Amino acid sequence: MLARCLSASLQGLEARPVVVEVDLAPGLPGVQLVGLPDKAIQESRERVRSALRNSGFRGPLVRVVINLAPADLRKEGPSFDLPIALALLVASGQLARPQLEGLWCAGELGLDGSLRPCRGVIALAAKAQQHKAQALVVPPENAQEASLIEGLTIRTAANLRTLVEHAQRPSTVARGAHHCRSQRPGQRRSKRRGGSELLPLH
């Protein structure tokens, strides 16, 4: 099964859109990562594998091909951990495909499934807003800077398990998950006072 998740790669001061594609196919278990990934991204195979297992999800027992498109764009950094993990969950049937529609995300994963901050979030948020993303998912430490981009819904959670559980139960606000809408006219004052709007994950 093929699944996709949207993210971006920082190129200087600008973020370039990247489609993370994950395909599961019959064959000897293994993970092949293509699309000009740097060393940090190549190592994401082990981080994601451990994060999935320690978060209570099934790891793939088939051949996995992960493609970062476009193939001619050099990608750097561990921020692709989260989109790879989410696409893997969809491809393996552990997360519904509609949960990723219109969603952009970035973040490093700890081996325990925790979401860790990444670089270039403001540029990524600006690009996501430009492409009319439904929402951007980032680690908690990046949520404040991402919210500087107006007109974009920002979602965050402490760990992968919380994020997925919230996605599967959109009518409830999972403990430890926070969702805020970027500043809009009339909201700037409440934002500066620390106010945030809780939103369900669609």
Task: Identify the role of each PLM range.
Residues M1-H202:
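Peripheral, non-AAA+ core regions of ATP-driven protein-machinery
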